[in-house]
Amino acid sequence: MEALVYTFLLVGTLGIIFFAIFFREPPRIIK
């Protein structure tokens, strides 16, 4: 049960960091 919570927190923090970096600078990789 604790492992699930830890993995959820890890994925959440990584997702927040990824979206912060993605929205901070314009997506040049897609174009």
Curated annotation (Swiss-Prot):
Keywords: Chloroplast, Membrane, Photosynthesis, Photosystem II, Plastid, Thylakoid, Transmembrane, Transmembrane helix. One of its GO terms (cellular component) is chloroplast thylakoid membrane. The keyword Transmembrane applies. One of its GO terms (biological process) is photosynthesis. The chain crosses the membrane at residues 3-23. Pfam families: PsbT (PF01405). It is found in: Plastid, Chloroplast thylakoid membrane. It is a single-pass membrane protein. PSII is composed of 1 copy each of membrane proteins PsbA, PsbB, PsbC, PsbD, PsbE, PsbF, PsbH, PsbI, PsbJ, PsbK, PsbL, PsbM, PsbT, PsbY, PsbZ, Psb30/Ycf12, at least 3 peripheral proteins of the oxygen-evolving complex and a large number of cofactors. It forms dimeric complexes. Found at the monomer-monomer interface of the photosystem II (PS II) dimer, plays a role in assembly and dimerization of PSII. PSII is a light-driven water plastoquinone oxidoreductase, using light energy to abstract electrons from H(2)O, generating a proton gradient subsequently used for ATP formation. Belongs to the PsbT family. HAMAP family: PSII_PsbT (MF_00808). This is Photosystem II reaction center protein T. The lineage of its organism: Eukaryota, Viridiplantae, Streptophyta, Mesostigmatophyceae, Mesostigmatales.
